[in-house]
């Protein structure tokens, strides 16, 4: 009585069966399912073992290529997560000894009981290689990594685009990340009745079979349409709970999911469920996605609707449950919009620190749109070129103006909400990605040799666990050439880490120079700062010991603020520095950040070595530093031989080698070659006012910083 549909070409065993309809009518239908799939998983494994072996061989070839670049941190992180674990010879030998010991024990037991069956049940040889059946146990040690994919509006995709998406998903499987796809055929964001209307049911089934057929062409283990895995209960779920999703959608029959995924089959899940009367109902695809997340996270529970066959499978499901690494939403609208970025979208979202602010921004945008005060096209940053392109340039194929209909902000809000709720239930290493189906269909290896290869955001994210573009990079107005009429760039989301800024610019505004009403903070005495942990962070990041007393003496009275990411996984210390030529002069009574007496200086930027290159810690700290704490610019120096200088250069307005070639100065300040207004100088002679520009003050500051390391060696800071 459980429906699933599999294309007959893959030959995983078929059986026809006439069953009563779920609504207890007498109409019968024919359904295709696997023979005893819930218990006889071994036969399925045998039928797909050759395909799995080929996939494993292809993945080993790819990982071998990655291993040829051991200096690449991204490659090492990918191999650490997805490479096939190997059993050591010692473990195999220990297993053989265990089997020998067990055999001797059994012999002694047979003597004590007086039962002697001779050598009939004795193993033949224990001292050679492991027995053939043991090879599969070694294979089972390899975890199944999974990505849940929600595909919105597949009915608007051409067969070619759908095929290219299927190709991408099959390439992800070869790299070690299996997928399960949830279909979302809803045209809008309004709430629908749970009644399944015939035209809607037929449309969803047609689109599901289109996707299954496309996946069959590229994924050798095949694909499967699963329609009976979900149950629905009309219970009131307003009570807060981490175990229940709104809408009462629950995974009821896990044996319809786990074995196919284990064998490399890609299940396509329709947004249908069955209530307590076994009646088919329509449910929201977001609720289906959250129910699957909970099940794969080990938080699912049955309310008695599990079938007897399913209950038999439950005894093994903890062992066979895949590891959910990614939640992916393919939405024609693209990523989460941002009014503060020239490219129009958040490329990386640290949910722990940014979720509430982004949600509030989207809610305000949604209310403006619904009241007619604005339109979704205001998601652009007002770039004149974007407006011209919107009005004068014809949209590219696949870019539809209806993507930015009045419901767009609501849809973005729903995407943000479902990923926040889903990632909250998963380990911190899990991540989410929102992108357009067209981006997912990008071919990394084009059909035409004359076509330039393009990066596929899904494959790039799988290999690097990062967004296509670093969120800390500055964006130019021309980086979003198509204007707001185009879908937003992809958004990468992580559960992330909390971000602490002292003082908090979200409360007090950007950091200000010290004054009687705004005294400088003291790192060692401020109760909000764990100074020993801060010192440990600096020591670990710089790989040398800081001299705490000398350092505190040097920055005393000049600390602008401190940024702390997570539990001191990364951070930045900023100071206000005065050029040596102005020390001792009388400053004006009222000081502003744009003053020759107070140059905003990045004194320490540190990230734990264990967090470098992963988790976005560097990007999180840098974005807070340059966009929130010092939006008007900051200056810093780095030793000329520092390999991080390329990273600094990409995020700065410019760089300059200081005299002596030991240091390189960087800055994010606009107009650094300009001067200051007359009223900002105070008691300084006119000649110095004419001669000193911002440029001279910054060079003076960066050349005069004294290192504060415990080894006493005057080498690079």
Curated annotation (Swiss-Prot):
Residues 35-70 are annotated as: Disordered. Residues 1-23 form a transit peptide. The keyword Transit peptide applies. It is found in: Mitochondrion. The gene is arg2. It comes from Pyrenophora tritici-repentis (strain Pt-1C-BFP) (Wheat tan spot fungus). Residues 39-50 have a biased composition (Low complexity). GO terms for molecular function: L-glutamate N-acetyltransferase activity. This is Amino-acid acetyltransferase, mitochondrial. Residues 51-70 have a biased composition (Basic and acidic residues). InterPro entries: AceGlu_kinase-like_sf, GlcNAc_Synth_fun, Vertebrate-like_GNAT_dom. Its EC number is 2.3.1.1. GO terms for cellular component: mitochondrial matrix. PANTHER family: AMINO-ACID ACETYLTRANSFERASE, MITOCHONDRIAL (PTHR23342:SF4), N-ACETYLGLUTAMATE SYNTHASE (PTHR23342). GO terms for biological process: L-arginine biosynthetic process; ornithine biosynthetic process. It catalyses: L-glutamate + acetyl-CoA = N-acetyl-L-glutamate + CoA + H(+). Its main location: mitochondrion.
